Amino acid sequence: MITELYIDGQRLDLSDDIDIRLTYSITDIENPVERKGTVSRTIEIPGTPSNDNVFGSIYRFDQWVIGFDPSVRVNAYVLQNGVEVFNGIAQLLAVKSDGQFKTYEVGLYGENVNLFKQLGDSELTDLDFSELNHEWDGSNIVDSWTNSVGSTGNDYYYPAIDYGQSSFTRTQAPAPYADVFTTADFYPAISVKKYLDKIVSGAGFTYESDFLTSQWFKQLIVPYGVSGVPYLTQEQMEGALFYIGLSGGVQDIADGTLQKVNMATDTPSPFFDGGGYDTTNKRYTPPYNADFNIQVRVNVQPNLSLGFDQTVKVYVRKNGTTLTQIIEYTWVAGGGSTAQQLSGILQMSLTTSDYVEVWMDFSVDSGTPISPAPYVRIFTDGTYWLNQISGTPLMQPGFIWNMNQTIIPKVKQSDFLMYLVRMFNLFIMPDKYDPKKLYIEPFSDFYDTSNYLDWTGLWDVEKGFEVVPCGYMNPKTYKFNYKDAGGYFEKRYQSAYQSSYGSRTYISSNEFSNGEQSEDVGFGNSVMVGFSPSPRIYARYYDMDNKGTASGGDVELNVKPVTPNLRILYHEYIPFPSETEFVFEGTEYTSYPYAGNLDNPYNPTYDLCFGIPRELYYQSDETSGAIYRYTNNNLFNRFWLDYVKLYTDKDAKKVKLFVQLSAVDVLNLDFRKPIYINGTLFYLLSVNDYDANSDESTSVELLKVLDLAPFEPTVFQLTGGIGAFISDEPKPQLITE
C-alpha cells in the first residue's frame, strides 16, 4: 500500500510505519455549531533533508524561518494508492530530536469551514435588505398578498396582525361584521428564506436543499418586531425639514393689504427642501404628525418716511383660514424708515392633512390716502424654516420603508440560523470537495434508504461486535419550547400551563434512562385569537389592562401595544369560511392576509407549534355552521418524532464493529447513505481511526434503522371533546373570552 502526504503542494518523505489515523463523525452534521471536521491523531514525519526544506529549516532555533510559516493554515492531503482519503489542513506542532535523529510532529485536520463560527457575532442588522425598500401604500400592501414570496417573490408580505391598532375588532359582535382597515394598520414582514439566503451568502457559503426551497418553507415570514409601532428613522425625520428663501428678488406689500409671502427658493445651499414644501403654491404639508418649530425671518423697509405709525405683521396661516401672528414691528411717526431684520418662532402641532403658509400685512395709521402710495418691501434675505421639536414620530403612510433601519430585529445571525436548525431538526453537511457548499435537509429527508452502501463483505467478523441498547444512554425527557413572547395571551397561557404556547414535552418509556434534553427556539410563537362568533382569527400581539363594556353590551378590551419579540409565522391569503367582510381602503375582500402558526386556521394541514396547544382562543363559527379544525401535524411529529424514537424505542440500538475499509470506501463515504450489513440497515455514526497506512480493519459505530410506522397526521374538529386525546396529546380547551 502506497501512502502519500502532501503539505502546501509538496510531497513529504514518510517512514514505512507511519501512523495516519482519520476519524469521521455524524456529530458534525447533527450539531453544526460544534463541527470539528475530519481529524487525525498527531503523526510523526522523519527529519529528512527534503522535509527540512518543506518546513523551512524551522528546527534551527538559531536561525530565522525561511519560507514556511507555522502560524498560517496550509493545505494538506493524503493519497492511498492514488486515491484521496483526506483533504484539509496541516499544523506543525513540534520538532523533536534525540541528538541523532529529528522528527516533525504534525496534526492533520479536516477543512473545518464552520458556517456558525464564520458568522461570529454578526447580527441580522448587519445584512443589507435595501432592495426591499418600498413605499408604504395600499397598492404595495394588496400586491404583497398575492405576489409575495409565495408566488413570484417580493420577499415581503403585509399580514393582518393585531399589534393593538384601533382598527382591529375585539368585540363579540354577530357575523357578518366587517373589520375596516387602512394602510396604517399593516406593517411589512420579510420571508424567512430571504433572511436565510442573506446569512448564508453573506458568509461566503452556498446551499442545496429541497426543504429550504420548498413552497411551504417559502411561506414562512418574520413579522415586524422592532417596536410596538413603527417610528420614523432619523433620515426620514430630516427629510421633513426645510429652509426656504424669498423668491423673485424683492416683494412689495401695499398699505392695507394681506399677502402671501413668496417663500419659494430651495436652492442653492444653504436652502433645501426635504420634500414637504410646495414651491409652486408656497405652502408646507408635513409628511408625519408632530410638533414643529416654524421660524420666519424677514428684512423689511417702508418706501416712505412718514409722520404716521407704519406697522408690519407676519403670520403663519394654517389650512387657508387660521392666522397666527408671529412677528409685529412699527416704525413710529417721525422716527424714520430704516430697514429692519425681524424674526419670530412659533410652535405648532401639524398633521399630514394640514398645510401652512407665511402671510404679511402692512398698514399706515394715516386716516386718509397718501400719495405716493406707501408700501413695505421685503428684501431677498428673507427666510423661512421648520424644525421638529422633539421625540420620534410614528411613520405615516406614504413614507418609504427603510427595511434596514425599521424592520430588521437585532438578533445574531448564528442564533437565527440555529433556531431554524432546532425547529426543523436540520442536518447540515458540507460538500467533501467544496466545504463552503452545504447540503441541508431535515432528519426526515436527510437519508436515502434506497441508496445504501453494502458493507456486508467488509465486516471483520473475527473482531466481534458490540450491541448497546440506546434507551438508558439517552435522556428520558425531551422538551421543545418557543421563547415566551410577552403579550397578554402568551402570559395567560404561560400562567395556566407553566410552558410557552405550542411547546411539547416527550417522555420516553425507558425506566433506566434519566436526564432531560431541551431544544429551545428563540422565536416567539403566535397566539391566534378570534372573538366568537366572528370568523376573524388573527395573531394578536398586545398587552391588556382590563375589560370594559361598550354600548350595546359588546365586550371591549383596553389594549396597549408591546414590543414584540422575534417571531415566525406561516402566511397565506385565504378565504373566510363563512359570510363576512374584510375591508381595506374602502374595498371589500372575501379573503384576508392571514399569518399564524397554522397554514390555515379553519382547515389546517401543518402547524408551527411543537405540540397541540392546551388552549385555543377561538372556536368554530356555530352561527354559520362552519366547523373549524386543528391538526397534530406539528413540528415535533413532522421533524423530531422518528429521530427521538431512534434513541428511545425498545428496539433502538447502537452497534460497534470492525470493517475492512479501502481508500475507495473512504472516498465514497457519505453520511446520507445508510450502511447495509447482513440484511439490516444502519445509519453511520462514526468511522474511528481509519489508518491510511495499515491493512487493519477499522472501528465504526452504527445506529439501527428502525422500521417505524409512518406518522399519520390527524385533523380533528374544534367542537367540544375536552379530555379526549389525539394520539398522545390532549385536545385543546376552547376559550371564548
What role is predicted for each listed range?
Residues M1-D273, T279, I378-F399, T406-M423, ...:
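Polar, S/T/G-rich
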Residues F55-S57, A652-L661:
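Short, structured beta-strand/loop micro-motifs enriched in basic residues and often containing a Trp
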Residues F61-F68, Q347, A663-N668, A692:
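Short, surface-exposed secondary-structure edge patches
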Residues G67-V78, V664-I677:
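Short coil-to-beta transition motif at edge beta-strands of beta-rich domains
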Residues G82, F362-V364, T680-Y683:
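Short, charged beta-turn/beta-strand-edge "cap" motif at the junction between a beta-strand
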Residues F86-A94, T680-Y690:
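Short beta-strand-centered aromatic/proline hotspots
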Residues Q234-Q396:
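Extracellular jelly-roll beta-sandwich "head" domains, especially the C-terminal globular C1q domain
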Residues F711-E737:
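Viral virion structural and adsorption modules
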